[in-house]
Amino acid sequence: MDNRRSLAQPSFSNKVIDTNELKNLIVWAFRNYGIARAANMADKLKDLGFHYATQAGISLSLEDLRIPPSKQSLLLGTIEDIKATENKYRRGEITAVERFQKVIDTWNNASESLKQEVIKYFKETDPLNAVSMMAFSGARGNISQVRQLVGMRGLMADPQGQIIDLPISSNFREGLTVTDYFISSYGARKGLVDTALRTADSGYLTRRLVDVSQDVIIREVDCKTNKGIILEDLVDTQKILINLEQALSGRVLAENVFHPETNCLIAHTNQDVSPKLAKEITKAGIKKVLVRSPVTCNSRSSVCQYCYGWNLAHGRLVDLGEAVGIIAAQSIGEPGTQLTMRTFHTGGVFTGELAEQIYAPIDGQLIDLDIESYTDVRTRHGEQALITKKPTQVTIRSKKNQKSIINLSKGTTLLICDGELVSKDQVIAESPRRNRLMTERAQKHVVSDLSGKICFSNLTVEETDNNQYTTRITKTGGLIWVLSGEVYSISDSANVIVHKEDKTKAGTILAQTELINHYAGEVRIHQNTNSSITNIQVITESIVIPGCYIYTDVIHKKESYILETEKKQKFLFKAIPNQKIQDGYTVAELISDTYKTTSGGIIKYLDLNVSKKKTGLDKDAYEILSPGYILWISEETHEINKDSSLILVHNGDVIESGTELVKNIFSKSSGIAEIIEKDGIVREIIIKPGSIYKLSEVYSNNDKSRGFLRPGERLHNNISTDKLVYWEYIENEQMPYILIRPVIVYSIPETKSSLIENLVSQKPSQTKLKLVKRTPFRDGERVKSIEGVHLVTTNLVAEIEHRDDNLISSIEFSAKESGNNYFDLRLSTFETLSIKSIDVNKSEKQQSQTRIIVKNGEYIKPFTVVASTEIIAMSEGTVEEIYSEKNTSRRILIATSSDKKTFNIGKSTVKVSVGDWIRCGDFITENMTSLDSGQIIEISSRSVTLRIARPYLVSNGAILHVDNNALIRRGETLAILVFDRAKTGDIIQGLPRIEEILEARKKTDVLLNPHDILDASFDLYIECGLALYEAARLSFQEIQLLLVKEVQLVYQSQGVNISDKHVEVIVRQMTSKVKIENGEETGYLPGELVELQKIEQTNKAITLRNKINASYRPVLLGITQASLNTESFISAASFQETTKVLTEAAISGKLDWLRGLKENVIIGRLIPAGTGFNMYDNCNGSSLEKKNLTANTNDESTISSVRDDLDDIILDDRTARNYFSNKSVE
C-alpha cells in the first residue's frame, strides 16, 4: 500500500461534478488509495452534497418550469412544413406512405429542436434553475422528461405500436387538451404493463444465465494458451460505442505490444493492462490488440486467471476460486430491467430516429460533385436525392472562397444538388442510424376522398391470375385520378332507364327494379308497429276447417290450445298461430287414455302392419298402416344401478305392492321379483305380476321356456286357460315353477273414422290434415317404465301436395263471430315477396325509393307488378357513364354543376389546353392559379372550365383495387401501398433481442442466423484442409465474437455499459459442445452432445491405438439448452424438465462430479468457490512454485483408489485433494 501511495500524487481537479465525473473521481480514489480511503472520501462527498443541498433548499415549483420563447415560432414553422407536405399529397407528388413518414419526421425534428432550445435556454438564462440542475446533474429525471415538462410531448404510439401522426404540441406546464390526454393514455398504460412484464422477463433471463454459467470458476493461474482475441473499437454506423482504451482496461495481453513507429516494447505477453497502460497503447496509434479471453482459455470447464484478467471490482487480477460465471450472469441479467423500460419511463413518447442528419457547417455553394459516386434515389419523404455508392466527400465553398469538406459514408443520402446554395445548419445529407435496421413489410390503404371515374396516368399494371381472383399490381409508379361526379350503384336485377348523355333533374328515375308475383291470389301487406312495410303476401288458398273450433285451456299447468270436434274429441295443439308448416308436420295430438298402460312391459303385434322406419319430421314413431291388435304383458321395471348389498329383496321373491326394494324405492304392483345383476352391481329390478304353478319335476321341454298360451291349449302338467296368457318357466333353488302372466289386448281399428270427414275439406286442396296413428315401440320391445306409457298416439298431420319453395303453408286462427275465446282453424297457402323496409311516413329526398302498386285485400293475377324500387337522381346533371363489369355491380356516373369549376380569364393568355391534367397550385393563365386539381374540359375566349378531380400517387408494387375507367364511390379503397417499415425500437432492441441472441433462436426474418454462419464457416475451414478440431475451434471463435458484439450493441444502444468478459463467459458456455455425427470406435452415439476438448482428447487416444476417430460438427446451444446439457445432471434437473433429466441420467448411468456451485448447494456441501476452493497440486506432481494450480479432475485411477478408503458415495475434487495431501505427508 505504501508503494501505491507514493505513486499517486494528489492532483487538483477543476470540473463540474456531475454523475460521470463523480464516478471517475471515486474510481480514481479507489484505484490509488484503496477501499478504506475511497469509502471515507465518498462519505465526505455525500455530507458535502447534503450540506449544500439543504442550504440551497432546491425544490421544484411551477415557476421553475420555464418554456423557451422560441417554441411558438418553431411550432408555426413546423405547421407550415406540414401544410406544404399536405399540399404535395393533394397534388399527387407524394404517396400516402411518404406523407405519413414526412409528417412524423417533421414533428420529430421539431421536438428534437425544441429539446435543444430548452437546454440552451436553461444554460443561458437560468443556469441555477432547479429543474435543469436536477436533470443535468443526474440527480433526478432526464432530458426527455424535462422536454415533456417545458418543451412538447411530441409523437405518441398507439396500442399496436403504430405512431399517431397527430402530435401533442403542448407540454405539461401548459396542460393537455382532452385529445392530448387520450392519446397520452396509450403510452402511460403501456408503461405500467411493460414494467411488470419486463421485471418477470429480466428475472427469468438472469436465472437461465446463472444456470448456464454457475460452474465457471477460476481454477488455475495460467492455462498456457497462446491464443487470444483481437480487440478494437466497437463501431456501429460511424459511431464508436466502446473505444479500444475502455475495452483494454483489465485484460491480459496475449502477445508483446510494440510501438508502431519506434518499435519499442510498450507491454509484454501476460501483462495485465491498467487504464494508464491502455491509454499509452491507444496513444501510440495501435488500433488492434491481441488479448487473452475466456473464450480461448484452454482450462477444462473453468477459466484461468490470465484469460479472465482483472476482477473489475478491485482493479487487480482475479482471485483463484472466484465464481466468475455467477458474476457474469448477474452483470448481464441485472441491467435487463433497464433495457426496454427506458422507452416507457417517458410514457410511451416516440423518440426513435431512423437517420442521422448531417448539417452544412457554413453558408455557401456545393461544388465539384462526383456524379459517378452517386445513384438517383427517392427518399422516404418522396423527394429526389442522391445516394452514395462508396465513401466519398462533398465540398462547400463560401462567398469568401473558404472551403469545407464533409466526408460521407456508403449509403448516405445527399439531399442537395451540384451548385445548390446552402445556409449554415441546413440539413444536406442523412446517413442511416443502423445499417442492420430490422424492417417488416407493411401495407397502407389509399381511400378515395370523392366519388367519380378512375383514370390511370403513367401507370403500368401487371395482372396475375389466381384460382379465385385476379390481382393487379403496379409495375411502375404513377397517378390514379378520380374525376368527380355522383355515382349510383345499380343492382343486377334492375333495369336502367336512362342512357349516356341524357340530362337528369333531381328526382329523375335512373333505374327500376320490379317485384312480380308468380301466383294469383289476394294481397296482404304486413306493416310493423313502427309503420315500416317489410313484406307482401299473395294468398293463393285459404280454407277454414268446418265442424271444429279452437279454444285455450290449462293442461299440465301450462296454457295450451285445444281443438274440439263435433264428436267432442279433443286434440292438443302442438302448432302455434301463424306457424309455417311443412309436409308431415304433426299439428295436434288426440287427448285420450285408451292406449295408456299402468306400467312398463313387453309389446307384441298381432296382425298389425306398421312402417319399417320411423316417420314424421322428428322421426320418432312408427306409423300404423292397417288395423290389428297390440298384446301387452305388463311388468314394472326399476333401474337401480346400486351395489347388490343394498338390495332389500332377492331374486325370485314373491312381493306385495308397496314393498321396499332399495332404500326409498317401493314397488307399485305385486308379483315375482327378477334381479338383473352385472359385476356386483344390480342394474334392474323387474316385478312380474301373475300366478305361480309349482312343478313336481324339472321341465323337460328344452325347446321353449316362455310363450303365449291361448284358450283351450294345455301346458305341462295340465295347465290350461280360458283367456290369452303369457307363461314363463322359472327354475328356483327349491323347485321349478311356471309363471302365468296376464295379457291385455288393445284393438286398433281402421283410421278412417267419422272424425276425419269434417276435418278434410270437400273440394280438392293443396294443404290437408289427415289422422295418423303411430306407435313409438317395435314388435317385441321391452318398455322399461314404472308410471306407464302411451302405446298408440292419434295425430293430426299436415299433408302438403305442392313442393314449390316459393309457396308457404301456415296455420292461422281466425276469431269466431260468436265469441272472442273461440277460433276457427284456417289453412293458408301464400307467396311471400320481401322488400326493403319502407317507412310510410318518410318524405325527404333519398337515392332509392320503393313504391307499392297494389292495395291490401286486392285480388291479383300471376306476373303482376306488385312493387317497384326506383333509384333516383339527387341533383341536376348529365349521365356521363354507365359502367358494368362482370365481377362488379353496375354503376351510373352523373356529372353535376358542382363537379365543374369555371375560371373567368378575361384577356389573359391561357397556359393550358383541353384534356390537360392540372394540379392545385398550377397556373391556368400567367396570373391565375387553380385551387383545385382536375382536367381541362373546355376553353372559350373568356373562360376555362375545369372538371374537378383528385390525384393519388401510387408506388410500384402497389395492389390495385380498381380498373381504369371504373366508377368508385367515396370511402372505397383505390389501392394498397406495400412498403418496408422499420420495426419499432422495443422489438429490435431491449430484452427480446438479448433473449433472441442468447437463446440462439433460428429466426427466419433476421439478417444473421448464427446457426447458418457457424455451419458455413465450419464447412469452409474443412474445405480449406483444416483438421476437424481446428475447423471447429475457429468457426466457434467466429461465432463467439459475433455474439459478443451483438449483445454489446443492444446494451450500448440503451446506454448500459457491460464489460466484454462477462458476455464472453456466457458465450463460451454456449459454444463448448459438438454434435457427434459418427462415433466410430470411440463409443459415442450419433447425435450425442460432447465437449469439444473432451472429444478431441478421446480422438487423440484412439489415434494412438490406430483406431478410427469420431467425426463431429460444432453446434451452438441457447442458454436453456446449454443448461440442460451440462455435465452435472443435478444442476440440469434443478433447472427444468426434472423428470426427463433424471430419467436420462439414470438410464445412461451418469456420474455427477459436483464441480459447480449448484450441485454442491443441493447436496448440502461447501461450494467449491471462495474459501471452499482448494489450491491443490496437479496429480503429475507440478509444484506451487509456478503458481500453476491446475486441478486434474479426470484421473480415473485416482478415483478408483480413493473409493476403497471412503464410505461416502459422493466424491468431489476436494476429497481427492485431501487424500493426496495425506499421502504426501506420510
Swiss-Prot record:
In terms of SUPFAM superfamilies, this protein maps to: beta and beta-prime subunits of DNA dependent RNA-polymerase
Look up the record and name the cofactor or cofactors this protein needs. Zn(2+)
UniProt: Zn(2+) binding residues = C223, C297, C304, C307
Quickly give the catalysed reaction: RNA(n) + a ribonucleoside 5'-triphosphate = RNA(n+1) + diphosphate
**Can you say where in the cell this protein is located?**
Plastid, Chloroplast
What note does UniProt attach to the cofactor annotation?
Binds 1 Zn(2+) ion per subunit.
Known EC number(s)?
Answer: 2.7.7.6
Q: Which domain of life is it from?
A: Eukaryota
Sorted alphabetically, the keyword list is: Chloroplast, DNA-directed RNA polymerase, Metal-binding, Nucleotidyltransferase, Plastid, Transcription, Transferase, Zinc
Q: Can the keyword Transmembrane helix be found in this entry's annotation? A: no
CDD domains cross-referenced by the UniProt entry: RNAP_beta'_C (cd02655)
* One of the GO biological process terms: DNA-templated transcription
GO cellular component, as recorded: chloroplast; DNA-directed RNA polymerase complex; mitochondrion
Q: Does the keyword Transmembrane helix apply?
A: no
A single GO molecular-function term is: DNA-directed RNA polymerase activity
Tell me the function of this protein.
DNA-dependent RNA polymerase catalyzes the transcription of DNA into RNA using the four ribonucleoside triphosphates as substrates.
Member of which family? Belongs to the RNA polymerase beta' chain family. RpoC2 subfamily.
Q: How does it assemble?
A: In plastids the minimal PEP RNA polymerase catalytic core is composed of four subunits: alpha, beta, beta', and beta''. When a (nuclear-encoded) sigma factor is associated with the core the holoenzyme is formed, which can initiate transcription.
Task: Give the protein's recorded name.
Answer: DNA-directed RNA polymerase subunit beta''
Species in which this protein is naturally found: Pyropia yezoensis (Susabi-nori)
